[in-house]
Every structure is written in structure tokens, then in C-alpha cells.
Swiss-Prot record:
The J domain is necessary and sufficient to stimulate DnaK ATPase activity. Zinc center 1 plays an important role in the autonomous, DnaK-independent chaperone activity of DnaJ. Zinc center 2 is essential for interaction with DnaK and for DnaJ activity. Residues 5-70 form the J domain. Induction: By heat shock. Binds 2 Zn(2+) ions per monomer. Zn(2+) 2 binds at residues 168, 171, 190, 193. Homodimer. Disulfide bonds: none annotated. Participates actively in the response to hyperosmotic and heat shock by preventing the aggregation of stress-denatured proteins and by disaggregating proteins, also in an autonomous, DnaK-independent fashion. Unfolded proteins bind initially to DnaJ; upon interaction with the DnaJ-bound protein, DnaK hydrolyzes its bound ATP, resulting in the formation of a stable complex. GrpE releases ADP from DnaK; ATP binding to DnaK triggers the release of the substrate protein, thus completing the reaction cycle. Belongs to the DnaJ family. GO terms for cellular component: cytoplasm. A zinc finger (CR-type) spans 138-216. This is Chaperone protein DnaJ.
Amino acid sequence: MAKADFYETLGVSKTADEKELKSAFRKLAMKFHPDKNPDDADSERKFKEINEAYETLKDPQKRAAYDRFGHAAFENGGMGGGGMGGGGFANGGFSDIFEDIFGEMMGGGRARRSSGGRERGADLRYNMEITLEEAFAGKTAQIRVPTSITCDVCSGSGAKPGTQPKTCATCQGSGRVRAAQGFFSVERTCPTCHGRGQTISDPCGKCHGQGRVTEERSLSVNIPSGIEDGTRIRLQGEGEAGMRGGPAGDLYIFLSVRPHEFFQRDGADLYCTVPISMTTAALGGTFDVTTLDGTKSRVTVPEGTQPGKQFRLKGKGMPVLRSAQTGDLYIQIQIETPQKLSKRQRELLQEFEQLSSKENNPESTGFFARMKEFFDG
């Protein structure tokens, strides 16, 4: 079967410069790389063709020979390279772009590669809902969290008591192996030890070689007074157990404060809308409000109070987290219009309306006068 034209393989013209070649190679190598197409023979074949084409065309001498003689330039030892031969990494190859293209795909470079050593346990998340009263006073909550803990039979080794894990013979304990892919040397997780660097011939009967078991733990969580909705509490070392002696992860408690029936919160301040009767608003009066600390606070309503009027109860809001300060409670007045009037009530209101003057309702009287003047000019 005749070889495909190198320029066609990379999808570039015969006048393509080095930048165009490199760009085309990056795109195709990422698309057909074996790590992204496991067990795909066609992709592997295409990947090798791309490598060979780029290796040839990026080298000025090889490209000149190819342009003149085609594939024949590299047959029977011509040019001392081509295919799987002389070029490669020894001549710079494409190691200059290897890490750039595949570094992230391979786990982000050497710093991220498993060495078969200690491995930190995973962090855990626990969602907790509390009441506004609990956020006000603070509390100690008991929670139960399913998590992975170190096996108490094998002490986390994964091996049956009296035995020890052995260094993996395939990767020599590194957890990684290298395999040739065309001009590339590709690093993968060791298929024998699955990245652990160790093998266990006689696994622990309780954890089955994992070194960890799943259990439900009871934990005490301290919720300070003044905590806000959406706050995250970190319990260090209370996440999943580490592997092979690695440190445990952390447990994060995500708090949500349940909406309250009467109070709305804004930072450390509380707001409460209180409906009062029309007569109380007109004549004045008092009412009591029960605050979150359980005490009652009396609010005095002056006569002539209008809808939306706010009264401030200083220091009756929420405590400020880790502070001696406290917010305020704001009472907003809502005037309730009477409904289902009796005949006598209706008569009295009609009589009241007849006795009313502009001074009794300055806002409404002034509003309609201003509107009339505005539109009538």
C-alpha cells in the first residue's frame, strides 16, 4: 500500500512554513493521540503517520529530499533516518512541543506523576441546615458522616497481617511505565499495580487490599453564634483516610440557614414587617415584638404613622461572628385596611370621610393637585 503524501497527512500546502507545520501537527496529534483513543487501531495508525510526516517536514534537509524524491528518499537507509530511525529525540525531535501538547493530558508533568508513595485522602462535603434561632445562639451539632477510614486489621497496608506489600516489578515502584508510540515515549499508569507502586499477593480479608474501609462516623460540629447562610466550616483531617500512610483529607460543612417565618436577615441586621390597624396608625398605640433572644420589646406607634414607617430596635439583631457587636432589628409598619365592614362601621367611616379636611390627608390631597396642575399646564 502506497504511503500517503506527508503534506496531505498534515493537511498543509507544499509551501507551508514552520509555524503552519507545527500548528497542524499540534491539532492532529491531540486528536489522534492513543491516550485519547484507547484500543482504536485506526487512530494509532494515523498518529504514527502524523509523527512521521512532521518529523520529516520540520527538518529542512529531510524536507528538501522528500520534495525531490518523495518517500524513496528514505528507503534503503537514505538520509539515515525517517520512519522509526535516526531522527527522533536525539536530534531534538519534537520534544520541544511534546510537553506543551501532552503535558496536561499525561497528568500535568512530572510533578503530578504517582511515585507509588503516600496519597492524601479525599476531602468530603456535608450539607447542614440550621434555623435562624440556632444561627443567633450558636450550637454544637452531632452529625454522622459516611467516610473511608484506615483499615484497623492491616493498618492501611492492604496486606494480610503478617505479610507486606511488594514493590511492583513492572514499574519498580514508580507507579508509571513508558511505552513507545511512534516517535513519542508515552508515560502511562502501571497496568500491574494501577499506579500504587506496590502489589499485594495476599490481601487483607477486611479491606480486600484497599487499606481502607467505609464506615459512618459521629462527629461534633461547633457552630458559632452569628454564623451566616453559605458559611463553610472546615474540619481538618476529618475527610477520607489517606492511602499508604498518607494524610487524611478534610471535611467541609456547608451551612444553610432556613428562612424564618417573621424575620429577614441582612448581615447582622434583622427586618420584620408588622401589620397594624388603621385606627392604631391614626390614633397611635403600642405593640410587643418577641426577638430572637426570647425577650419582648415594646414598640410605640405615634399617631399619624404612615405605611412603611420603620422603627429601629438597637442591639436586637444578630450577633456579629467572632465579635462583641450586635446588629439591629428594624420594624417596618404595614397598615391593614379593614375588610367586611358592618353597616354601622361603614356609616362611621363615611361620616369620618365627610369630616376630613386637607390637613388630615396632606399627601393624597397634595398629590392629586400636583398631578392636575402638571397635566393641565
